[in-house]
């Protein structure tokens, strides 16, 4: 039973290895075969992201070119400065209430919230566009060169030939093992070494207690 489980485990390991290497080789084959469509998809996605990033930059610029936004931003700045003054002045309770009323009016006008100010919105948009620019710089620009297509071709060839080579080496080694050796009582020995074959026979026979006792017993 244990011997059967060992054989089954070895078979499963070999099968998983072959399937894994076959998957790698297949992925390399399809990547090489369809490198043109893949490159086109990459180019389309790269251009879309770049286009969206440009639109976000335009929105960020247009936000502060709007007169209403400029005015609200200035009012917001004045509110923040006014609150700093009232915090250090115990006689400015009346001014503080006026600031609260003004802030309440701004909330009604444009859903104004001091925690989501226009300057913070612009900074957030700028951070997003800067991050996207940095990411785009790390990837090949398909509008300027064919680096991505070249990388795809090289990697796909490496994957394909590596997978095929390892699988081929495995089957060739297995064929040579079967061709030049044979099993004797469960032990694989060389077909071209009679002395070793004889030794293997003797060792296997002497492992049997009955044979050992018959040969060396009193």
UniProtKB/Swiss-Prot annotation:
Q: Which domain of life is it from?
A: Bacteria
Which keywords does this Swiss-Prot/TrEMBL entry list?
Cell membrane, Membrane, Transmembrane, Transmembrane helix
Q: How does it sit in the membrane?
A: Multi-pass membrane protein
Q: Does the keyword Membrane apply?
A: yes
| InterPro entries documented for this protein | MG279/MG280 (IPR030940)
Q: Where in the cell is it found?
A: Cell membrane
One GO term of the cellular component aspect?
A: plasma membrane
Q: Where are the transmembrane segments?
A: 8-28, 158-178
Q: What is this protein called?
A: Uncharacterized protein MG279
Which source organism does the UniProt entry give?
A: Mycoplasma genitalium (strain ATCC 33530 / DSM 19775 / NCTC 10195 / G37) (Mycoplasmoides genitalium)
